[in-house]
């Protein structure tokens, strides 16, 4: 995807004051986007979204997502943050120059959510996760998977995730790729 001329960079995007109903993702970066920078999602109400922030990481395409801010979000979701290898369109070809993909300077703050999985994150040798901030987070979660050690240089301030036994019935990424 990074060698296709139609897949240029995405910079300086502001999404604000929206109300999302049933959607796959409120903000999805990838799988065709390869360089996204300075993206802001703020002042959002979410009703039954499958995911709020979805960072698709293709193992066959170098990607770089940076300076992404998710601020003042409230509502109900399956997964709040999803970062996983995305293999739906996997086409490695004969490529031998695969640079490491990276997500850095990602901030989530002022969040009030009912989630099935707030932190749906998987490590991979294909990408690096660094400099994430979680601040003023209050949510319920059935998976209770938040683990700041999965992301290098994570800052977590006032993060309050409380367990919830019953699922809200929304699909999470662990259920299938998409």
Task: List PLM regions with ranges.
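Extracellular/periplasmic carbohydrate-active domains that bind, remodel
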Residues: 1-178
